[in-house]
Each structure stands twice: as C-alpha cells, then as structure tokens.
Amino acid sequence: MRTMRGAALVLVLWLIALLTAMIGAFALTARVEALQGSMLRNGGQAQEYARAGMEYALSRLSSGEPQARWRPDGRRYRWQMDDANVEIRIIDESGKVDLNMAEPTLLAGLVRAVGGEAGRDVRLAGAIVDWRDGDTLTQPGGGAEDRDYADAGLPYGAKDGPFETLGELRLVLGMDAELYRKLLPHVTLYSGRSRPEARFATGPVLTAMGLDAQQLLAQRDAPLGLPGSDATLGGTDTYSIESRARLSQGREAVLRAVVRTGASALPGSAYTVLRWEEGAAVQ
C-alpha cells in the first residue's frame, strides 16, 4: 500500500514538473511573439516616418520662401515628427559624377579623392570607360576589355554598353568593395552631364574637378545674404534623398531614394522614383 502511495506521489510530482515546464514554455513563447510583434510594429512605424521625411524634404525644396527652402548640397537637416527624430540629407544629382558621361580624367580624380592609390586611379577610370563604350579598344594608360576580364578569371567581360544600375560599378575590373562603398555616394546615372554642377557637388567631387573644396563648402554655409550663400538654393529636378528615422524606443529605419520631380506616370504623384532602398540597414 505504501509502495502504491509512493509511486502515486512520484507520478504527481512528475506531472507537476511537466505542467510547470509547459506553462513556462508557453509563457516564453508568448513573450517572444509579443516582442516580435512589437519590433515589427515599431519597424513599420519607423519606415513610415522615414518616408514622411522624404515627402517633407521635397516640400521644403519647392518652398516659395528662400529662408525656408532646403538646399540640395548634402547638408543634413533634422526634423521632429511625433516621437520620431528624422535626419534628412538631399543632394542634387547634377552635383555627382555621371558614370555614363564623365571623362576619364574626372573619374580618375574622383578615385584619388576618395582614397584610391596613385596609378590605380587611371587604370580604374579607363576600365569604367571601357565598360560603357561600344568598342573593344582599351583606353590609353589603362582600362579593361573582355580579354582582361578573362585573364583575371572572371566569367564575364566588359559590358560595352551604358551603365544601367550603380551596382554595375562593382563588376568593373579592379573595383573592390571598399572603394565601391566610397565612390557610391558621389556617382550617378541621372545627370546627363559630363561635368558635375559645382554648386551641389560634394567635397570629393569638387576635388576631382580641380576646385578648392574647402573654400566652396565654406561659402555654402554662409548665412543668406552673404556672397555665395544662395548658390545652392533651387536645383534641377532630380535628387537623391536619404531619410533616417529613429523612434524614442531606439528603432531605426533608413530610406534612400533618387526621385525626379514634376509630372509622373503615376496619377496624383508629384515625382518619379528612379531608385528606392529602404529598411533597417540599407547599404
């Protein structure tokens, strides 16, 4: 009899332990799901604030009041919306180096300006031109055509056609991930200019153009009314916009877009999207 009671007690204890474990597992699962839901909700909110930042930037670019108008020269603007802090940066695409139009000397200058080694700049600039041109002749002083890609063990050759995406730059012979990352903020496919517009150019682009970047950037920062202070008011019609939203809980989202203002194929839209990247960790 005592043996049966002891066995029953052990069984009850095992059942209690099992139920406790099940309850704990259920509570943990519920907690994890709640946290996941909260993260998804906060992430979605952060993305919407980042999108709102882009829309707000476009409205400030077209403001009729010069004092209220934002300048598309790369300076950072901060905007508060509800509990989100939004940091916005706008660059007129005409101030960047157009990969399909720039001369080799300008491309080489940009490579040097972002830290590319001497000697490599000319070779890489030639390879960029060889990628986009329609012939099979290597650029003087450097470059890369199909045979050079084959010798490097790559399964592709020079495109012999215009760049269609900025990502193609990473495929050019001699380009590495670090240099690509440094060049990316300063190049475009949308200006159609062989030489960037200095009013909106970043420091490395100004240096590549042979201009005094320090002096020109200082003039942009001068208060309105002083010489050079209104140089970057206005702009063309194509802008790259980076909008970074951070919620009070710490959740962050980034939107990077290239947009062309004016008539759009989409009814009711005041701009056309040319490039769009968003998320928590846009590269």
Curated annotation (Swiss-Prot):
Q: Which residues form the propeptide?
A: 1-6
GO biological process annotation, one example: protein secretion
Q: Known InterPro entries for this protein?
A: GspK, GspK_central_sf, T2SSK_SAM-like_1st
Q: What is its main location?
A: membrane
Q: Does the keyword NADP apply?
A: no
Its keywords, alphabetically, are:
Cell inner membrane, Cell membrane, Membrane, Protein transport, Transmembrane, Transmembrane helix, Transport
Which residue windows are transmembrane per the record?
9-30
| Annotated Gene Ontology cellular component terms | plasma membrane
Q: Which domain of life is it from?
A: Bacteria
Give the record's PTM text.
Answer: Cleaved by prepilin peptidase.
> Is Transmembrane helix there in the keyword field?
yes
List the Periplasmic topological domains: 31-283
> Subunit notes for this chain?
Type II secretion is composed of four main components: the outer membrane complex, the inner membrane complex, the cytoplasmic secretion ATPase and the periplasm-spanning pseudopilus. Interacts with core component XpsG.
Q: What does this protein do?
A: Component of the type II secretion system required for the energy-dependent secretion of extracellular factors such as proteases and toxins from the periplasm. Plays a role in pseudopilus assembly and seems to control its length. Interacts with the pseudopilus tip complex that is critical for the recognition and binding of secretion substrates.
Family statement drawn from the similarity comment of this UniProt entry: Belongs to the GSP K family.
Q: What is this protein called?
A: Type II secretion system protein K
Identify the species of origin: Xanthomonas campestris pv. campestris (strain ATCC 33913 / DSM 3586 / NCPPB 528 / LMG 568 / P 25)
